[in-house]
A protein has these predicted regions:
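A structural motif corresponding to the C-terminal lobe/cap of the Radical SAM core domain
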Residues: 93, 112-144, 178-182, 266-282
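Radical SAM/AdoMet-radical enzyme domain recognition
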Residues: 1-125
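Short, small/polar residue-rich loop motifs at catalytic or cofactor-binding pockets
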Residues: 183-187
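Cysteine-cluster motifs in flexible loop/terminal segments that predominantly coordinate metals
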Residues: 237-285
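Short, acidic, Ser/Thr-enriched surface-loop or helix-capping motifs
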Residues: 93, 192-193
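A structural signal for short, well-ordered beta-strand segments and their strand-loop junctions
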Residues: 71, 98-100, 145-149, 191, ...
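C-terminal accessory region of radical SAM enzymes
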Residues: 121-172, 197-253
Length: 285
């Protein structure tokens, strides 16, 4: 854009007609991420709208026809986890270059979404499956950009697998993870909602730190008197439980504080979605 910002959208894709795709291209949109919840039957059931799957794929193809970079978005939960192999099949058949698999992020005390999340063993199995499917695509000469998002335990887990399968590259992976520093909610990531409210990220909207219609974003973001936001700049000093003693804290960043608050009622408690074992996170003596 003229301001030097990269503009992207996440959408269900159903309203992206050929004309709308041309408009998105004309405004120099960088990327369009289209959400799928599985193959046709499951997707339409999730959305509660007949033919939403077909319309999503039509939107995807319309974007591709205009030369827009596209990708798929898939949020993992108990009801659609079995669809992951089918989604990889779609990735191949539709020649889509990118897919993001999102772990559930629940926020707000008593969140109903907690019961939709996988248990730790299921999550480990899913991450292994995603890595296996990604490797199979690469070996078949169809490399794709495959991301897992919103659970920073994935980084250490991938690294530990790399140690077994490719020790030489494992060191490179570890360095990249250290550089990334894991979760950056309230530090490197922020959210401004449609009405100007400022949040630590797009999930944690039950905490509002100010409004850009009333005060400049920079003043809100760097205000030391906004206690929670100020502490988010240095989470490692405040996290508790397993997070506080974890050897991967520097590359995970303490994961999501919103999940900790939703599950335990304490934003500084350990993230309940961390599936690494006590032995795996134990610091060497």
């Amino acid at each position: 854009t003229e301001k030097g910002m990269r503009a992207v959208i996440s959408t269900n894709g159903t309203l992206i007609t050929k004309e709308k795709a041309r408009e998105l291209k004309a405004i120099n949109l960088s990327y369009v991420g289209i959400s799928l919840d599985g193959a046709e039957e499951i997707h339409d059931k999730f959305r509660g709208v007949p033919n939403s799957f077909k319309k999503a794929l039509e939107g995807l193809e319309n974007c591709k026809a205009e030369g827009l970079k596209v990708g798929l978005r898939f949020t993992i939960n108990k009801r659609n986890v079995v669809e992951i192999p089918k989604v990889f099949k779609l990735l191949r058949e539709l020649e889509v270059p990118r897919i993001c698999f999102y772990h559930l992020v629940y926020s707000g005390r008593g969140s109903e979404m907690i019961k939709e999340d996988l248990n730790h063993a299921e999550t480990r199995s899913v991450v292994d499956l995603i890595m296996d499917e990604t490797r199979a695509l690469f070996d078949a000469g169809m490399p794709k950009e495959v991301l897992t998002v919103d659970n920073h335990a994935d980084g250490p887990y991938v690294w530990m697998r790399m140690l077994k399968e490719d020790p030489k590259r494992a060191e490179e992976v570890f360095q990249l993870l250290q550089y990334n520093e894991g979760n950056s909610s309230g530090r490197g990531i922020g959210c401004i909602s449609w009405d100007g409210k400022v949040h630590a990220d797009q999930f944690w909207r039950n905490h509002t730190f100010g409004n850009v219609l009333e005060r400049p974003f920079s003043e809100i973001w760097d205000d030391p008197n906004i206690e929670l936001l100020h502490k988010m700049k240095n989470k490692k000093a405040y996290v508790k439980g397993r997070c506080a003693s974890c050897r991967f804290l520097n590359i995970c960043g303490g994961n999501f504080r919103s999940r900790a608050e939703a599950y335990y009622g304490d934003e500084w408690a350990q993230d309940p979605a961390c599936y690494l074992t006590d032995d795996e996170i134990r610091r060497p003596e």
